[in-house]
């Protein structure tokens, strides 16, 4: 099973679809990186290490960019081509499913590592030491009040930097978004098990859009959706210490969501028929 996971992981890293990284890097630079570097120049101060990532993953301007990027990379998961049928025969359905779950988790962490690196590299020349938010984030509106309501100049909102340190914010964001990607991947896996891949892909998109849009407008209903719980946006009020959703509740939400999907997957795999799972006319039933 370990060898199979390693082989599939290597294929995931090396496949041609990774060209989307170039488009992601360009978009991040144009929307986030160039703006943050400009802010640092205006304030004559450096950026905190985690600010580029936090702006990329949690800005109201590009709130859905990371989940969309991840869903595109994972859209063909699980990959069941002719060569994989022998693997399922040899491993057994349950071991195959466990391998797919581990593979999805590895890919989720990998995607978040890529997002962090691609978010940080464009601003590397402006990053300085320090554990607190930079003046480019916290004081820009004070010195340039005319830019207060300009979305591009508010990539990191006050409801984030007024309540939590950047390092802690980045850790929570990375962990919750990793769980989000993992959850979306499990839904694709369930869709394949029940031969309803397109339906579950559509459900992923709807959940992503609903949670992201509600978080963008700071509506509390965002926390009924996985994407809303993965975001820092709208989690706090701008003034005061009121929390709309404590982090521990978001971790509980994500954990329950993932556990429920794992239960469905393991129940479904017992009833899985491999007929038509890859190509409708080329496989015989295996039960």
Identify what each model region corresponds to.
Residues 17, 92-94, 196-201:
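Membrane-helix interface segments
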Residues 23-26, 198-212:
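Central hydrophobic cores of alpha-helical transmembrane segments
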Residues 72-89:
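Transmembrane helix boundary and interhelical loop/hinge segments in multi-pass membrane proteins
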Residues 1-24:
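Aromatic- and glycine-rich beta-strand/loop motifs that create alpha-glucan
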Residues 275-287:
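Single conserved hydrophobic/aromatic residue that forms the stacking wall/gate
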Residues 28-76, 98, 102-193, 228-254:
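Secretory targeting signals
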Residues 266-275:
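Membrane-interface capping segments at transmembrane-helix boundaries
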Residues 5-6, 13, 94-105:
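Interfacial transmembrane-helix starts/ends
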């Amino acid at each position: 099973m370990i060898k199979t996971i390693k082989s599939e992981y290597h294929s995931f890293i090396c496949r041609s679809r990774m060209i989307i990284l170039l488009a992601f890097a360009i978009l991040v630079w144009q929307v986030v990186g160039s703006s943050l570097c400009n802010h640092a120049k205006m304030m004559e101060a450096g950026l905190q290490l985690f600010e580029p990532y936090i702006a990329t993953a949690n800005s109201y301007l590009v709130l859905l960019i990371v989940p969309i990027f991840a869903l595109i990379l994972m859209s063909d998961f699980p990959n069941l081509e002719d060569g994989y049928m022998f693997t399922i025969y040899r491993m057994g359905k349950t071991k195959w499913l466990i391998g797919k779950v581990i593979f999805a988790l590895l890919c989720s962490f990998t995607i978040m590592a890529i997002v962090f690196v691609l978010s940080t590299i464009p601003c590397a020349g402006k990053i300085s030491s320090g554990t607190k938010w930079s003046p480019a984030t916290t004081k820009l509106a004070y010195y340039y009040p005319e830019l207060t309501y300009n979305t591009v100049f508010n990539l990191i909102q006050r409801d984030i930097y007024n309540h939590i340190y950047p390092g802690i914010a980045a850790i929570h964001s990375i962990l919750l978004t990793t769980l989000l990607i993992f959850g979306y991947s499990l839904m694709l896996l369930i869709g394949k098990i029940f031969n309803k891949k397109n339906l579950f892909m559509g459900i992923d998109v709807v959940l992503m859009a609903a949670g992201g849009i509600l978080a963008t407008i700071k509506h509390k209903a965002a926390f009924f959706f996985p994407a809303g719980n993965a975001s820092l946006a709208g989690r706090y009020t701008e003034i005061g210490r009121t929390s709309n959703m404590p982090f521990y509740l978001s971790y509980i939400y994500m954990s329950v969501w993932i556990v429920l999907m794992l239960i469905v997957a393991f129940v479904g795999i017992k009833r899985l028929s491999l007929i038509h799972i890859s190509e409708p006319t080329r496989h015989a039933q295996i039960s």
